[in-house]
Amino acid sequence: MLVLKLLLWSIISGLSLAEQVWRNSNAIRTIDLRSTYTKTLTSLIIVNEGDEPQNTYRYFQQTSPGESVLSLSVSIKEEEKKGTNPIKVNNNVYDIPLQPPVKPGESRTLLIQAGLDGGVRPLPAAVDQDEEQYLVYLTTLYLDSPYTTDLQRTRLILPSAKIDTYTTYNIDGAELPNRVGNTLVYESRETITGEDNDLGEIYVRYEHTVPIPRGADLYVQIDMHEYRKMLEVSERVVFENHAAKLKSNFDRAKWYMGNFYNPVSTAINRVVYSLPRNSKDVYYTDEVGNITTSHMRVEPHQTWIELNPRYPVFGGWNYLFQLDWKMPYEEFRSSKNRREYLDIPLAWSPGDMIYEKAVWSYVFPEGATNIEIEMPVEISNSNVTKIHKFLDTLGRQVFTYEALNVTDGVPSDIVHISYEYNSSAFFLRIAIITTLLILLAAAAYMIWAP
């Protein structure tokens, strides 16, 4: 019966019996619920108990009901946290390559970071305008792995110490979890085999009365101007609030009166941008038009922009706005071997959230050739087009990239751009302008000359 069970597990998970050579000597899971989506860090000490070197470890990323994996990255501690690219087998199953292969009896420490979406939900789903919000999260007590695990610890970090309910256990006479402030720690020395189906359950309900912003759409356009030495940037964002919805209609009078004593609220009432220090010509618009409810503060190293929407964005509501500005080319550019190099942030929009769909459009100066762009995110679609602006002759190349489910941290990543610039396009434009002026003067002379 045990052999049949092992064979069935092998078929389901895609593992053969010959690959059951790993053992998890220690597993530490850290689940961070302080962000707008769930961040996990799993530290695994794996030991090769086989007779041959192994170069692949199969990992199951645990998710709660309705939760999906947005991103997953792996580093190896023994190799100075060198990264390795996990290979996705199916929804939550990944093969982690190990180079050099792990010899029999040797161990490796894997550090696995993941971003998860859909596991946290408000309960109740609707609240009053000035009522506290409670969120719930569900996970397993033990690591879900096809291999045997000896020691393990699950650590939940919550936004505050206001924890309403959480699951308790008594394991080997020890009361779990150990609670310190906003942290719950479940620790077990019980050996769990890969065939164990009962992984336990951890349920936690906690108070967190803040908005849960999410970017439904992000569009970034950057125009590069060689002759003006400027970058023109435009960011259009559609925000959604995934917090608890309003139980009744919005009371504007109560909202404005509440601003005098700063009550807790699940509404988004401001968005903060950090721009380069020499940014100028900043303007902020939405679907209606220009908005004056914004504040700009210039500091030595950066410029802060605080945007205030026309209305508070409560749970289930959305808001579209666009921010445009200009900044000096030279702050991002360097030249080498007749090539121009630009290191530009992926986006300036606020991080700590998910962007369901993101599009980047890079408009190069006329005369740019041999263009190379290195994007720091996985691209789902890309294309190259050509446009003509005022007095253009050759046209400008536009590189457009699209990505799905871009997560926090990524907006601070860097896009590496390089190209060769032929200044003859600029002089051709001057020649055209000069020729037009001469023709215009000649025509005026022929018309008005006696």
From Swiss-Prot:
Coiled coil segments of this chain: none
Transit peptide found in the keyword field: no
GO biological process, one term: protein N-linked glycosylation via asparagine
Residues glycosylated per entry: N290, N383, N405, N422
Any one annotated GO CC term: cortical endoplasmic reticulum
Segments on the Cytoplasmic face: 445-450
Main localisation: endoplasmic reticulum
Highest taxon listed in the record's lineage: Eukaryota
Membrane-related topology note: Single-pass type I membrane protein
Keyword Transit peptide part of the UniProt annotation: no
Compartments it resides in: Endoplasmic reticulum membrane
Signal peptide: 1-18
Transmembrane annotation, as ranges: 425-444
A Pfam family the protein falls into: Ribophorin_I
InterPro entries, sorted: Ribophorin_I (IPR007676)
Lumenal face residues: 19-424
Function: Subunit of the oligosaccharyl transferase (OST) complex that catalyzes the initial transfer of a defined glycan (Glc(3)Man(9)GlcNAc(2) in eukaryotes) from the lipid carrier dolichol-pyrophosphate to an asparagine residue within an Asn-X-Ser/Thr consensus motif in nascent polypeptide chains, the first step in protein N-glycosylation. N-glycosylation occurs cotranslationally and the complex associates with the Sec61 complex at the channel-forming translocon complex that mediates protein translocation across the endoplasmic reticulum (ER). All subunits are required for a maximal enzyme activity.
Family membership: Belongs to the OST1 family.
Subunit structure: Component of the oligosaccharyltransferase (OST) complex.
The name this protein goes by in its record: Dolichyl-diphosphooligosaccharide--protein glycosyltransferase subunit 1
Organism: Schizosaccharomyces pombe (strain 972 / ATCC 24843) (Fission yeast)
Gene: ost1
